[in-house]
């Protein structure tokens, strides 16, 4: 989804500036062992009921890494049953002190930190993202998000209300119950943490379906959940496909809430399934076509760099990617030249090499989808300025691609490509670019680059997006809410707002013989 709070990490001079040099990063494990390939239900490793398995593929080579259990509806039923039992009144989990839930989450964070190199290596192997980003960005965020919500566990509570009459009134923030969670493949461990941490901090139990493209790191984290001491049934991890296992979670009558991160198209299906079943609570973090707007007074070098990383970070596989770059007419030509040169300099290659900036797309389907959009952009009349083809002969690599002369009615201007393709647009006036930026079904993020504070503040109010960045991009921390307007989803993850999605507010009113202030 995004680049976390490490704004200098991906700078021109040092992509590993949080460490003194690339040499300061630990060496990756090039062939990590794969100890877990079964479903994790009730703190036990189990085969799928059907005994089916499916392959997980190394996108760097296109070769099969191994096979994992293919869970489906029957396995979801088993997992939901375990989660419901763990959530019953009087269970060890329900009777556990909130501070103890926080201690378990902190313990989990410690275990992730202990195994950080292994987990980062596993993420790079299965997902294809550069190891230095897996280690320095993703794992850093994972550890922080578990610790952040651990701190909230005994601080998220109700309040007393001075209501009229002879009554004493207070509210309780209670866990919703069994939470179904469906996570994507672009940030497997991060998305797992974004969803697990607030759910567990507030006392829920979880049935999680992980992406079929990237199951390995999530399964290993399940082993750490057991090692940390979470009771059986509190967390259950299912590997399988969306139309079977994912749909079973969304439709399940004994799942109280579903949280999904992924495409807007699937988000519609999740919302419908929730409505057609038991009206379960729904949180959706979906797609985007986010604008980056560069005004003529912007710091040119900085804006070029930020807009480049806004799009190309994580191989363009971010829902909040800055996938529409609007540049004021008077600086458009210079910005375009610098942007093309920067894209040509981006190092594509083996993600285990510490100076690699761009790895492969996650799988063959995404690889072909992105190449299809590149061909479509050329057919529609956009000018291909660099890239536009595969890189190398093995794996799913695509050269960084920049289009100029893009028009708003082109499909590459309207649809989420989810790959390393940067379309550039020209604009003349502020009101014009605001209208064009907002003319989209999406509303996840936006950015504006300017030295004029008044203009910056005006844009932050005018842009229809859940997050607006000024003179930066992709800066997200566990402390700040993240989510979208319009068809980019509903609800928020992270921060204090992220806790609201996992609790019900109960009002308790007691008649008293006499009320005194």
UniProtKB/Swiss-Prot annotation:
Q: Residues where N6-acetyllysine occurs?
A: 51-52, 364, 383, 399, 414, 426, 429
* Pathway it works in: Alcohol metabolism; ethanol degradation; acetate from ethanol: step 2/2
For the site labelled Transition state stabilizer, the residues are 186
Report residues binding NAD(+).
Answer: 262-267
* Reaction equations catalysed: an aldehyde + NAD(+) + H2O = a carboxylate + NADH + 2 H(+)
* Family, per entry: Belongs to the aldehyde dehydrogenase family.
Under the subunit heading, UniProt states:
Homotetramer.
Identify this protein by name.
Answer: Aldehyde dehydrogenase X, mitochondrial
């Amino acid at each position: 989804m995004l680049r976390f709070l490490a704004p200098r990490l991906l700078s021109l001079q040092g992509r590993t500036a949080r460490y003194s040099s690339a040499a300061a990063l630990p060496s990756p494990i090039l062939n990590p062992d794969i100890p877990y390939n079964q479903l994790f239900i009730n703190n036990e490793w189990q085969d799928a009921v059907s005994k089916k398995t499916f392959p997980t593929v190394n996108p760097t080579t296109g070769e099969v890494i191994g096979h994992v259990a293919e869970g489906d509806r029957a396995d979801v039923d088993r997992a939901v049953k375990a989660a419901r039992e763990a959530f019953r009144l009087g269970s060890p989990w329900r009777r556990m002190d909130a501070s103890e839930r926080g201690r378990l989450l902190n313990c989990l964070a410690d275990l992730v930190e202990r195994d950080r190199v292994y987990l980062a290596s596993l993420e790079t192997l299965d997902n294809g993202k550069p190891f230095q980003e897996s280690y320095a960005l993703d794992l850093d965020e994972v550890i922080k998000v578990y610790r952040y919500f651990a701190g909230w566990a005994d601080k998220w509570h109700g309040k007393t209300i001075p209501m009229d009459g002879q009554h004493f009134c207070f509210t309780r923030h209670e866990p919703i119950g069994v939470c179904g969670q469906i996570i994507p493949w672009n940030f497997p461990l991060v998305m797992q943490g974004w969803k697990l941490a607030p759910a567990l901090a507030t006392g829920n139990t979880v049935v999680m379906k992980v992406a079929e493209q990237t199951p390995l790191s999530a399964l290993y984290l399940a082993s750490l959940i057991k090692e940390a001491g979470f009771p059986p049934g509190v967390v259950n991890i299912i590997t399988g496909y969306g139309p079977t296992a994912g749909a079973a979670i969304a439709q399940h009558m004994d799942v109280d809430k579903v949280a999904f991160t992924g495409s807007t198209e699937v988000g519609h299906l999740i919302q419908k399934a929730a409505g057609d079943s038991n009206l379960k609570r729904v949180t959706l973090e979906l797609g985007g076509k986010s604008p980056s707007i560069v005004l003529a007074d912007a710091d040119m070098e900085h804006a070029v760099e930020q807009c480049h990383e806004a799009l190309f970070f994580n191989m363009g596989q971010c829902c909040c990617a800055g996938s529409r770059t609007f540049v004021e007419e008077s600086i458009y030509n210079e910005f375009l030249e610098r942007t093309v040169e920067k894209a040509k300099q981006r190092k594509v290659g083996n993600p285990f090499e510490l100076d690699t900036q761009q790895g492969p797309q996650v799988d063959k389907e995404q690889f072909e989808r992105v190449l299809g959009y590149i061909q479509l952009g050329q057919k529609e009349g956009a000018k291909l300025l660099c890239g536009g083809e595969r890189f190398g002969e093995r794996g799913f690599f695509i050269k960084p691609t920049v289009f100029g002369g893009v028009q708003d009615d082109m499909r590459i201007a309207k649809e989420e490509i989810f790959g390393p393709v940067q379309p550039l647009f020209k604009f003349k006036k502020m009101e014009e670019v605001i209208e064009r930026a907002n003319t989209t079904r999406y509303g996840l993020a936006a950015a504006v680059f300017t030295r004029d504070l008044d203009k910056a503040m005006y844009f932050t109010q005018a842009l229809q997006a859940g997050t607006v960045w000024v003179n930066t991009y992709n800066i997200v921390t566990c402390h700040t809410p993240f989510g979208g307007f319009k068809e980019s989803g509903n609800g928020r993850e992270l921060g204090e707002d992220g806790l609201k999605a996992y609790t019900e507010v109960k009002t308790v009113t007691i008649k008293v013989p006499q009320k005194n202030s």
